[in-house]
């Protein structure tokens, strides 16, 4: 399955399970950790936990058996590592505080070339 298809499936799973403010960020040429980052909000700690567990379960059905959840002990953040797509699930206040969308959406500065006189 292509990475873009995996991303679309994840977005659909999140939407079907009432995740809020689902945002996808293209990380190609910005990071080697993944091709895409998806950020979404949940309404409660339990909702975040459910979203992360549902994602892993649904991705297993698509043949992605080794996805994992980080932040199991956190009440306001979960991360699902789906290899080329990473998913951050936040309580709205924590999402606003960390503002990953702004950080990862900005252009990467290009190195300046100096010529010697």
Which residues fall in each region the model found?
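Mid-chain, well-packed structural core segment of small domains
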Residues: 58-86
């Amino acid at each position: 399955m292509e990475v873009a298809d995996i991303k679309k499936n994840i977005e659909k799973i999140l939407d079907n399970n009432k995740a809020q403010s689902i945002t996808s960020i293209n990380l190609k040429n910005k990071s080697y950790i993944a091709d895409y980052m998806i950020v979404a909000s949940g309404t409660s700690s339990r909702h975040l936990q459910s979203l992360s567990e549902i994602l892993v379960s649904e991705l297993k059905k698509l043949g992605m058996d080794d996805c994992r959840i980080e932040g199991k002990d956190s009440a306001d953040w979960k991360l699902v590592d789906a290899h080329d797509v990473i998913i951050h699930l936040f309580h709205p206040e924590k999402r606003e505080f960390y503002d990953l969308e702004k950080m990862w959406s900005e252009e990467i500065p290009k190195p300046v070339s100096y010529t010697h006189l």
